[in-house]
Amino acid sequence: MKENNEQKNCLNDQYIIKYIDYIKFEKRLSENTIKSYLNDIEKLYSYSKNYYKFISKDINKYLESLDYLDSRSLAHLITVLRSLYAFLNKEGIISHNPCNDVVMPKLKAKLPNYLTIEEVNKLLDINLVKPNDYRNKAMLELCFATGLRVSELVNLKVSDINFNDCYLRVIGKGKKERIVPIDDIALKYVKMYNDYYRNKLLKNKDSEYLFISSYASKITRQAFFKLIKSECAKKGIEKEISPHTLRHSFASVLLKNGANIRVIQELLGHEDLKTTQIYTHLINEKLKKDYEEYHPRSRKE
């Protein structure tokens, strides 16, 4: 992150430096979130170094100049600006948040891509030969069994797993801790990897992290994403894959099998139920399909 930050002109500004320290140390936002915030703040700073003197009409004029942004990017930018100006207001640097009256663009719900059970089973069918294979199998099984974010998965420590009581201690967004149960199958492969193959990847080095790369260090998010894409390509799964594909698949399977959405919210570590409710489209699809199949008046002549 440091390398990227040095390229940002906005980090020469004392108020922005204070704000970044605030979201990093007090709000405890993740490194990736801070990077995305900085990208938007850099846009504002490039537009005007007197951003802290802006009133509502200045903000609206600035937003009008960004007509090349799609609605999702614009909504993210407005969220960042509201947060920045709220901080400046709280610190007494400005007397009013000029973003208070800004209207958010309407967003079409972006439905998460997920794998069917058949596709998941294909993905998890890994030929176990090398230590890397056992690690990959353990990671994929665990990810589908728990719905962990990729960042949570790669940051797991051996001490976070309770093999006796079958649960994980997960440190999620904002350093919030949650307990997530693990099923017997995933636990079996994680234990097998940890007991017999992890040390082979460590090559006599020490690490507190559970999943180890071929370079005897903690595996990265990028490496795991590459693994998912590679395995999907091998298995002929042609869907658009993201780092969260297995997380979405986990939530989708639970919902389709009747799990309470509040339980899914807790397992996924979502602070806001609205974030979890995007998965309810799956229930609506199933209801519609069942209605069309079984209701006599839904059948077309």
Feature annotation, model-predicted:
Residues 1-301:
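Conserved catalytic core of the tyrosine transesterase superfamily
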